[in-house]
UniProtKB/Swiss-Prot annotation:
UniProt record similarity statement: Belongs to the aspartate/ornithine carbamoyltransferase superfamily. OTCase family.
Catalysis performed (reactions): carbamoyl phosphate + L-ornithine = L-citrulline + phosphate + H(+)
Key words of the record: Amino-acid biosynthesis, Arginine biosynthesis, Cytoplasm, Transferase
Organism name: Brucella ovis (strain ATCC 25840 / 63/290 / NCTC 10512)
Protein's recorded name: Ornithine carbamoyltransferase
Length: 312
């Protein structure tokens, strides 16, 4: 998404045109190949990425830090307690100040609205590294992972099991942008937000919703799940018993296509949303997903910065 000043923000998959998302994905593949071949790239030497964390993270922090460094740049980490974002200083003022110091801002926050407001007032690119509503960087890594293992994602069917959370919201947006289908199995009361489903369907995604996990898994090309309780939402969590039928185990995987993959953004609660047998099994690609956060996010950083005359 570009604002009125031509700044490219990576807000959601719905805010970036399909052609540009595909270009980012292909760039990620190319950058990964060059890295594996031992090539060194430093297009953003001297550039700085501010990383704002209101929610703790392992994969997001390390992958963005390493990615920016591999591109030649540097990072500075700011925690919510250090910044008091939107409390002691307005988000608008914070955005304007940070824009004078750094070349891009990455934010992992609890509130989607805070991320949107930061992007509204920043004069450098803002990247959504996770909000309670969406997780677009993760899904770009997932699409990359699927295509590495199984080829073009177009026309394939993903089956989601469990809570209708932020990862699912970005998955259905990706379905519209990359032309694949999503079967959603959630217990009543845990459905995804309707605005994301409505947008995906209006933009061509095939979305099926059910309370029956076996129906959703039937013939699917990929089974996806996440923790039953998202980080920071423990006080509002439903009892685990309602999710037990949605556990991804060998019996559920057997309902999918024999070549189906298993995905999970991690960290996983083994024995809850997924069994050891599945997550450690041959169909699981969870650690490839984790690695591909690095490559996808490097391509996202490059997409945000390229048109600002900051390297390639």
């Amino acid at each position: 998404m570009a604002n009125d000043n031509g700044i490219k923000h990576f807000i959601d998959l719905s805010t970036v045109p399909a052609t540009e998302l595909r270009a980012i994905l292909e760039d990620a593949k190319a950058r990964k190949a060059r890295l594996k071949a031992g090539e060194v790239e430093r297009p953003y030497a001297g550039k700085v990425l501010a990383m704002i964390f209101e929610k703790p993270s392992t994969r997001t922090r390390v992958s963005f830090d390493v990615g920016m460094r591999q591109l030649g740049g540097e990072t500075i980490m700011l925690t919510g307690s250090e910044m008091q974002l939107g409390r002691s200083e307005t988000i608008a003022d914070t955005a304007k100040v940070l824009s004078r110091y750094v070349d891009a801002i990455m934010i992992r926050t609890t509130a989607h609205e805070r991320m949107l407001e930061l992007a509204e007032y920043a004069t450098v690119p803002v990247i959504n590294a996770l909000t309670d509503d969406t997780h677009p960087c993760q899904i770009m890594a997932d699409v990359l992972t699927y295509e590495e293992h199984r080829g073009p994602i177009k026309g394939k069917t993903f089956a989601w099991m469990g809570d209708g959370n932020n990862v699912l919201h970005s998955l259905v947006e990706a379905a519209a942008r990359f032309d694949f289908n999503v079967n959603i199995a959630t217990p009543k009361g845990s459905e995804p937000k309707s605005q994301y489903i409505d947008w995906a369907r209006a933009n061509g995604a095939g979305i099926m919703s059910t309370t029956d996990p076996e129906k959703a898994a039937s013939g699917a090309d990929c089974i996806v799940t996440d923790t039953w309780v998202s980080m920071g939402q423990e006080d509002h969590a439903r009892g685990h018993n309602v999710f037990i039928p949605y556990q991804v185990n060998a019996n559920l995987m057997a309902k999918a296509d024999p070549k189906a993959l298993f995905m999970h953004c991690l960290p996983a609660h083994r024995g809850e949303e997924v069994t050891d047998e599945v997550i450690d099994g041959p169909q699981a690609v969870v650690f490839d997903e984790a690695e591909n956060r690095l490559h996808a996010q490097k391509a996202i950083l490059a997409w945000c910065l390229q048109d600002r005359g900051l390297g390639a």
